[in-house]
A protein has these predicted regions:
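Gly/Ser/Thr-rich phosphate-binding loop
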Residues: 276-279, 289-377
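Conserved pre-ATP/AMP-binding loop-to-beta segment of ANL
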Residues: 19, 154-184, 191, 217-227
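Conserved AMP-binding/adenylate-forming core of the ANL superfamily
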Residues: 22-52, 57-66, 70, 74, ...
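Conserved AMP-binding/adenylation subdomain of ANL enzymes
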Residues: 203-227, 234-321, 330
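Conserved C-terminal "lid"/linker of ANL adenylate-forming enzymes
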Residues: 458, 483-486, 492, 523-566
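Structural core segment of the AMP-binding/adenylate-forming
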Residues: 51, 78-157, 502
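Conserved ATP-binding/catalytic segment of the ANL
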Residues: 393, 400-460
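Conserved AMP-binding A3 loop
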Residues: 33-35, 180-207
């Protein structure tokens, strides 16, 4: 158990950084200082007390990233209740299921989400509040809480007759082993599980983030006055930990985008906010590489210049400068996570010395398992496991050369799945070892190299392990391929389901009728890059992008080899 405590970390941060900006709504322009945020937290604590909320009670939260989403999260956890953040991409049926399964007593939501919920579908919810201004949307019995919120300023002044001072920023003692977060997974297996995370789990992640440093320059990634642009869903463990909880612990300024991050919106916001840390999924950088960098390198004078040893360094320097300018020209580090990164994109970014590192984690570890500063990052890896917080082993007779399942134990590992002993026992051993389901090799220094998911691994007829993700990575680099899936048929053959990049094809004037032949040419080229046992026998075009989870992982379970014949 760690000595530090997350609740006390925020108590200190709100006091020490009281005049600093904490949260900004990018489109509304509304900003809360740390002091103003602490006052809003205090008002919600009064509401919780009036409602009879006790430590351990559940409070559900759903909505776009905005300041009051963050305030609700912090108010709940510093009170000792359990926050249940729900991904806004979930279907109404899933949202209702999570509210009921978690036994939440209160619900805070964006106003538009209430249109999809009937009161009788969530009978244990006592009251619903708006994330627009915290007004009461619905109260099951009577109007006591509605009246209390209507008179919140009077109630607040009654509690703090001399005004709210920094000495009033004092939260109850909440032990590190207490559950304060119930995080429902994205359901890539088709079933959402409630991950029980403790004060200790979150503390471990935040403490590690506070110590993240470029060991060459001495620059701390998360620091007082640092800026982040939050565009990943905060209900997801990755975005929550590093776009929200970590900067808030050190006096960082979090700007919340609050809209779907289209390239146009995102790059405009980057120019305004000029973030010092950017947390993103690989797709963001992969799109920039494909749409902006590759065309320059493949056509025109630059395609010739990069092949000349003395010129290519200068060309790479120009590209690096332009990319950094596109992201606000102030960034110290791109922390990439949530999914594997395309190897070609990664290799290019490292070649131009782009400030990038790739981490690895999972919701069940709140989420971080491995991370390396960008100046120490090894190509193809996802960083070193966190030696101070975790033990990691590879279930393989030769972990350095033969992939095996990553197994983890330590400060970040969850208590289990809520009301689900059966699934908990499947992944969590009695002595605390968590089975991640991810296959990897590991260097002697603890650097991990992910190969794929154990559930997606295919065993060839000759006994060789085939990782579909590795083949997909190669195929996705080929001409006019947007994304792909490698599937195994009943007779053991590998077949590819490919989504063409229709937008790029149109820009280049490629006839749609030519796409099947282009994809067949890609298949021929792909097989020259693969071992004999990995070769793909057939390819079919899929007409639309694959359905994905909120963290942009393809929902593989929705797709079967039968689609290849349609």
């Amino acid at each position: 158990m760690l000595q530090e405590n997350l609740i006390k970390i925020y108590e200190t941060s709100f006091r020490d950084n009281r005049e600093m900006p904490a949260l900004t709504d990018y489109f509304k322009g509304e900003t809360f200082s740390y002091y103003e945020m602490a006052k809003e937290v205090a008002k919600l604590h009064l509401l919780f007390k009036k409602a009879g909320i006790r430590q351990g009670d559940k409070i559900a939260l759903i909505g776009r990233n905005n300041p009051r989403w963050c305030i609700t999260y912090i108010a709940t956890t510093t009170y000792g209740a359990v926050i249940v953040p729900i991904l806004q991409d979930f279907t109404p049926a899933d949202i209702i299921h999570i509210i009921n399964h978690s036994e939440s007593r209160m619900l805070f939501l964006g106003d538009n989400f209430w249109d999809n919920i009937e009161e009788e579908q969530i009978r244990q919810i006592e009251a619903v509040f708006s994330l627009t201004d915290f007004h009461t949307i619905y109260e099951r019995d009577g109007k006591a809480l509605t009246k209390f919120q209507r008179d919140i300023l009077k109630n607040y002044r009654s509690k703090y007759p001399r005004g709210f001072s920094i000495n009033d920023i004092k939260y109850p003692e909440i032990p590190n082993d207490q559950v304060i977060l119930l995080n429902y997974t994205s359901g890539t297996t088709g079933y959402s599980k409630g991950v029980m995370l403790t004060v200790n789990n979150l503390t471990g992640n935040v403490i590690f983030a506070q110590r993240m440093i470029n060991t060459q320059t001495g620059t701390f990634y998360f620091r007082k006055g640092g800026r982040t642009l939050s565009f990943l869903p905060l209900a997801h463990a990755y975005g929550c930990a590093f776009d929200f909880l970590s900067p808030l612990a050190v006096g960082g300024h979090i700007t919340l985008l609050g809209k779907i991050p289209s390239p146009k919106i995102l790059l405009e916001a980057m120019g305004v906010v000029r973030p010092t840390v950017i947390c993103c999924v690989p797709m963001i950088l992969e799109k920039v590489y494909r749409k902006q960098v590759m065309p320059m390198l493949e056509k025109g004078p630059m395609s010739i210049a990069v092949k000349i040893p003395l010129l290519n360094t200068a060309i790479y320097s120009v590209i690096r400068k332009k990319l950094l300018e596109a992201f606000g020209n102030n960034v110290d580090i791109f922390i990439v996570g949530g999914a594997p990164m395309n190897q070609e994109t990664e290799a290019f970014l490292m070649k131009i010395k782009f400030p990038i590192t790739i981490g690895y984690g999972m919701t069940e570890c709140a989420p971080l398992i491995s991370f390396t500063p960008d100046n120490e990052f090894k190509a193809g890896s996802c960083g070193r496991y966190l030696h101070e917080q975790l033990e990691v082993k590879i279930d393989s007779p030769d972990p350095q050369h033969e992939a095996g399942e990553i197994i983890v134990r330590g400060e970040h590992v969850m208590k289990g799945y809520y009301k689900n002993e059966k699934d908990t026992e499947k992944v969590l051993e009695p002595d605390g070892w968590l089975h991640t389901g991810d296959m990897a090799t590991m260097d002697p220094d603890g650097t991990l190299y992910i190969r794929g998911r154990s559930k997606t691994m295919i065993l060839s007829g000759s006994g060789q392990n085939i990782y579909p993700e590795e083949i997909e990575d190669k195929l996705n680099n080929m001409y006019l391929v947007l994304e792909s899936l490698i599937l195994e048929t009943e007779n053991g053959k590998l077949k590819a389901l490919v989504v063409p990049d229709y937008e790029q094809a149109e820009l280049e004037g490629v006839d749609k009728n030519d796409l099947p032949q282009i994809m067949q040419n890609n298949l021929t080229e792909l097989n020259t890059l693969l071992a004999a046992y990995e070769r793909v026998s057939e390819l079919a075009i899929y007409p639309t992008e694959f359905e994905k989870t909120p963290k942009r992982s393809i929902k593989r379970y929705l797709y079967s080899p039968s689609l290849l014949t349609k």
